[in-house]
Amino acid sequence: AVDYFQEQGIKDRNALATILGNIKQESMFVPNICEGGSRTSYHSCGRGYGLIQWTSADRYYGLGDFAKKFGGSPSTLPTQLRYLTTEVQWKRIEDRMKTPGKSIDRYMDYAYSWIGWGIHGARTSYAHEYANRLITVEV
Protein backbone atom coordinates (compact mmCIF):
# COMPACT_ATOMS: atom_id res chain seq x y z
CA ALA A 1 0.00 0.00 0.00
CA VAL A 2 2.87 2.40 0.76
CA ASP A 3 4.25 2.03 -2.75
CA TYR A 4 0.83 2.65 -4.26
CA PHE A 5 0.28 5.90 -2.37
CA GLN A 6 3.83 7.05 -3.13
CA GLU A 7 3.13 6.41 -6.82
CA GLN A 8 0.06 8.63 -6.41
CA GLY A 9 2.34 11.46 -5.27
CA ILE A 10 2.10 11.20 -1.50
CA LYS A 11 5.67 11.43 -0.26
CA ASP A 12 5.47 12.91 3.24
CA ARG A 13 6.12 10.36 6.00
CA ASN A 14 3.34 11.71 8.23
CA ALA A 15 0.82 11.76 5.37
CA LEU A 16 1.65 8.17 4.44
CA ALA A 17 1.56 7.12 8.09
CA THR A 18 -1.86 8.72 8.52
CA ILE A 19 -3.26 6.84 5.53
CA LEU A 20 -1.79 3.56 6.77
CA GLY A 21 -3.02 4.15 10.32
CA ASN A 22 -6.54 4.71 9.05
CA ILE A 23 -6.52 1.60 6.89
CA LYS A 24 -5.17 -0.47 9.78
CA GLN A 25 -7.92 0.82 12.09
CA GLU A 26 -10.63 0.17 9.52
CA SER A 27 -9.60 -3.24 8.18
CA MET A 28 -6.15 -4.34 9.37
CA PHE A 29 -5.32 -4.28 5.62
CA VAL A 30 -7.66 -7.23 4.99
CA PRO A 31 -9.49 -6.35 1.75
CA ASN A 32 -12.22 -8.99 2.12
CA ILE A 33 -13.27 -7.98 5.63
CA CYS A 34 -16.88 -7.16 6.39
CA GLU A 35 -17.96 -4.84 9.20
CA GLY A 36 -17.73 -6.85 12.41
CA GLY A 37 -14.64 -8.76 11.29
CA SER A 38 -15.87 -11.64 9.15
CA ARG A 39 -13.91 -12.45 6.01
CA THR A 40 -16.25 -12.77 3.09
CA SER A 41 -16.77 -11.84 -0.52
CA TYR A 42 -17.98 -8.38 -1.48
CA HIS A 43 -21.38 -9.72 -2.56
CA SER A 44 -21.90 -11.53 0.76
CA CYS A 45 -21.27 -8.49 2.93
CA GLY A 46 -23.76 -5.76 2.08
CA ARG A 47 -22.14 -2.74 3.74
CA GLY A 48 -19.04 -1.85 5.73
CA TYR A 49 -16.62 -3.68 3.46
CA GLY A 50 -12.96 -3.62 2.61
CA LEU A 51 -9.91 -1.53 3.37
CA ILE A 52 -11.75 1.54 4.60
CA GLN A 53 -15.05 -0.16 5.42
CA TRP A 54 -17.13 1.38 2.65
CA THR A 55 -20.47 1.61 4.45
CA SER A 56 -22.80 4.11 2.80
CA ALA A 57 -24.72 2.69 -0.15
CA ASP A 58 -23.09 4.98 -2.72
CA ARG A 59 -19.57 4.13 -1.59
CA TYR A 60 -20.19 0.40 -1.12
CA TYR A 61 -21.92 -0.04 -4.48
CA GLY A 62 -19.39 2.32 -6.03
CA LEU A 63 -16.69 -0.23 -5.21
CA GLY A 64 -18.64 -2.98 -6.96
CA ASP A 65 -19.37 -0.82 -9.99
CA PHE A 66 -15.72 0.24 -10.21
CA ALA A 67 -14.54 -3.38 -10.08
CA LYS A 68 -17.01 -4.42 -12.78
CA LYS A 69 -16.06 -1.50 -15.02
CA PHE A 70 -12.32 -2.16 -14.77
CA GLY A 71 -12.39 -5.95 -14.68
CA GLY A 72 -11.20 -6.43 -11.11
CA SER A 73 -12.58 -8.07 -8.03
CA PRO A 74 -14.00 -5.78 -5.35
CA SER A 75 -12.51 -8.15 -2.78
CA THR A 76 -8.86 -7.57 -3.72
CA LEU A 77 -6.27 -5.08 -2.53
CA PRO A 78 -5.30 -3.72 -5.98
CA THR A 79 -8.91 -2.99 -6.96
CA GLN A 80 -9.70 -1.38 -3.63
CA LEU A 81 -6.61 0.83 -3.71
CA ARG A 82 -7.47 1.99 -7.22
CA TYR A 83 -11.09 2.64 -6.27
CA LEU A 84 -10.11 4.48 -3.10
CA THR A 85 -8.08 7.04 -5.04
CA THR A 86 -10.90 7.69 -7.53
CA GLU A 87 -13.58 8.44 -4.96
CA VAL A 88 -14.74 12.02 -4.59
CA GLN A 89 -14.04 11.85 -0.85
CA TRP A 90 -10.39 11.09 -1.59
CA LYS A 91 -10.15 13.67 -4.37
CA ARG A 92 -11.27 16.36 -1.90
CA ILE A 93 -8.22 15.76 0.31
CA GLU A 94 -5.67 14.42 -2.17
CA ASP A 95 -3.83 17.71 -2.70
CA ARG A 96 -3.63 18.28 1.06
CA MET A 97 -2.23 14.78 1.57
CA LYS A 98 0.37 15.54 -1.11
CA THR A 99 1.43 18.73 0.70
CA PRO A 100 4.47 17.88 2.83
CA GLY A 101 5.41 19.12 6.27
CA LYS A 102 2.19 18.69 8.23
CA SER A 103 1.73 16.92 11.55
CA ILE A 104 -0.06 13.60 11.85
CA ASP A 105 -2.86 15.43 13.68
CA ARG A 106 -3.31 17.79 10.72
CA TYR A 107 -3.30 14.95 8.18
CA MET A 108 -5.74 13.10 10.46
CA ASP A 109 -8.10 16.08 10.27
CA TYR A 110 -8.01 15.76 6.47
CA ALA A 111 -8.50 12.00 6.69
CA TYR A 112 -11.69 12.39 8.70
CA SER A 113 -13.43 14.08 5.78
CA TRP A 114 -12.19 11.22 3.57
CA ILE A 115 -13.22 8.27 5.74
CA GLY A 116 -15.75 9.79 8.13
CA TRP A 117 -15.17 7.28 10.90
CA GLY A 118 -17.66 6.74 13.68
CA ILE A 119 -15.06 5.44 16.12
CA HIS A 120 -11.61 7.03 16.20
CA GLY A 121 -10.03 4.01 17.86
CA ALA A 122 -6.27 3.60 17.62
CA ARG A 123 -5.82 5.15 14.16
CA THR A 124 -3.65 8.02 15.45
CA SER A 125 -1.50 5.65 17.52
CA TYR A 126 -1.12 3.42 14.48
CA ALA A 127 -0.14 6.45 12.39
CA HIS A 128 2.60 7.39 14.87
CA GLU A 129 3.87 3.79 14.83
CA TYR A 130 4.06 3.87 11.04
CA ALA A 131 5.76 7.27 11.03
CA ASN A 132 8.46 5.87 13.30
CA ARG A 133 8.99 2.91 10.97
CA LEU A 134 8.84 4.62 7.58
CA ILE A 135 12.12 5.66 6.02
CA THR A 136 12.20 8.58 3.64
CA VAL A 137 14.80 8.65 0.92
CA GLU A 138 15.81 11.78 -0.96
CA VAL A 139 16.52 11.09 -4.62
PLM segments and residue spans:
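Stable alpha-helical elements in mature extracytoplasmic
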Residues: 1, 15-19, 77-80, 84, ...
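Second-shell loop/turn segments in exported
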Residues: 1-10, 65-74, 95-96, 112-122
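Export/targeting segments at the very N-terminus of extracytoplasmic proteins
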Residues: 1-28
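Short acidic/histidine-centered micro-motifs embedded in hydrophobic/aromatic stretches
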Residues: 21-25, 36, 113
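Peptidoglycan-targeting cell-wall enzymes and recognition modules
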Residues: 27-101
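Active-site or metal-binding loop neighborhoods of secreted/extracellular toxin and effector enzymes
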Residues: 98-139
